């Protein structure tokens, strides 16, 4: 086996110059142990197998374009598996000779006297005479109303009809009322969810701005990835829990949350102060405190039954409580300024400068315009996370 054979080769594989890309033996046998190079090389009795020289033909085949395997491919011996694409026309279905299997024609309608015998009774003179009965008219024309005259209905029938209408109550709500009742809460929920998702992005945006201050001119990279717990390259604003920078990220976001709450509280105090609803008592002229005695509550309002709260201050004369009304606006701001001026005397030196600066209104406006033009884009990047808070502040301003 494997030596030179004097017999000429028979069957497939005679042309040994053809390459053998998939490892077939020249005699088209898969293994020498099954009779390769023997007297019976054609041991695989495939009646429709193709010959080896046809492998040089360009075809689609099961092994890709350009090669048709000798055995017909792994998909079988069909023409499609050997790369021969044929189009078989679709045979139309035979016409049905049975007309009864299709749709039947609509049968002729029976006469009205057979299908609706009650209609014949409605058209009878006896039926029209029955309609003229006062008891029957009371059902169709209550309260004596009639097209032919005033007819008093039977009392028991009318009372029965009224009792039925009283039990039924109001008519069923229309689809328009139901839709309007559901549409409002859905819009409020959608707007609230949108504002909530936008507000939750504020800490991350402020955290990115905070960390960018430490990487001026470069991209922020977490320094914890070079420590004993190596992690992949990531931003310091998205540290995983195993990163040492995770605790610093949580601390920064906690400080940012406190800052946002403080900002909302300041806005609420300013709003309540502007509407005169903060119980802040102004300083008594000539004193540094708001009360000089034990009285700190006020039992009666300053000006009648006012809805705004009042502040109770004590007179230094007889010690009786006197309710002093809160100023209409900016009482809290005035109180803070007076309190700070008492504690820090150097703030009083700024008053003339502020008054002089405010008096130069054209200069102030031009300065503000110039600063916004120069610092506007940078301020927008800093203040853009706070834009979702503006609708909340607006709602508080309108409804409080």
From Swiss-Prot:
Ranges per topology, Virion surface: 2-181, 275-348, 399-400
Protein location: Virion membrane
GO annotation, biological process: caveolin-mediated endocytosis of virus by host cell; fusion of virus membrane with host endosome membrane; virion attachment to host cell
Pre-S: region residues: 2-174
Pre-S1 as annotated region, ranges: 2-119
Subunit structure: Li-HBsAg interacts with capsid protein and with HDV Large delta antigen. Isoform M associates with host chaperone CANX through its pre-S2 N glycan. This association may be essential for M proper secretion.
Protein name (Swiss-Prot/TrEMBL): Large envelope protein
Organism of origin: Hepatitis B virus genotype A3 (isolate Cameroon/CMR983/1994)
């Amino acid at each position: 086996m494997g030596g030179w054979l004097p017999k000429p080769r028979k069957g497939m594989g005679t042309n040994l110059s053809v390459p053998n890309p998939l490892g077939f033996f020249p005699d088209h046998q898969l293994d020498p142990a099954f009779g390769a190079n023997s007297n019976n090389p054609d041991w695989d009795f495939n009646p429709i197998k193709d010959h080896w020289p046809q492998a040089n033909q360009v075809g689609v085949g099961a092994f890709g374009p350009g090669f048709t395997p000798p055995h017909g491919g792994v998909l079988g011996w069909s023409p499609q598996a050997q790369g021969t694409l044929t189009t078989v026309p679709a045979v139309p279905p035979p016409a049905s000779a049975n007309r009864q299997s299709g749709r039947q024609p609509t049968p002729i309608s029976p006469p009205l006297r057979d299908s609706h015998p009650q209609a014949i009774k409605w058209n009878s003179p006896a039926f029209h005479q029955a309609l003229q009965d006062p008891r029957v008219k009371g059902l169709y024309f209550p309260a004596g109303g009639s097209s032919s005259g005033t007819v008093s209905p039977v009392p028991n029938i009318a009372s029965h009809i009224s009792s039925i209408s009283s039990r039924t109550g109001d008519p069923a709500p229309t689809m328009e009322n139901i839709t309007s009742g559901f549409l409002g809460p859905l819009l409020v929920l959608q707007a609230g969810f949108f504002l909530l998702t936008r507000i939750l992005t504020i800490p991350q945006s402020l955290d990115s701005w905070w960390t960018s201050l430490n990487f001026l001119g470069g991209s922020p990279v977490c320094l914890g990835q070079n420590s004993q717990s190596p992690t992949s390259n990531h931003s310091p604003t998205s540290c995983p829990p195993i990163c040492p920078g995770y605790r610093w990220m949580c601390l920064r976001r906690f400080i940012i949350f406190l800052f946002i709450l403080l900002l909302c509280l300041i806005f609420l105090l300013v709003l309540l102060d502007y509407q005169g609803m903060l119980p802040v008592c102004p300083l008594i002229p000539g004193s540094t405190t708001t009360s000089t005695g034990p009285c700190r509550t006020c039992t009666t309002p300053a000006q009648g039954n006012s809805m705004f709260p009042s502040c109770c201050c004590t007179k230094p004369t007889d010690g009786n409580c006197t309710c002093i009304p809160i100023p209409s606006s900016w009482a809290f701001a005035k109180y803070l300024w007076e309190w700070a001026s008492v504690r820090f005397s150097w703030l009083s030196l700024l008053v003339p400068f502020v008054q002089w600066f405010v008096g130069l209104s054209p200069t102030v406006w031009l300065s503000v315009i110039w600063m916004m033009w120069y610092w506007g884009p940078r301020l927008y990047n800093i203040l853009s996370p706070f834009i979702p808070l503006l609708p909340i502040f607006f709602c508080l301003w309108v409804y409080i």
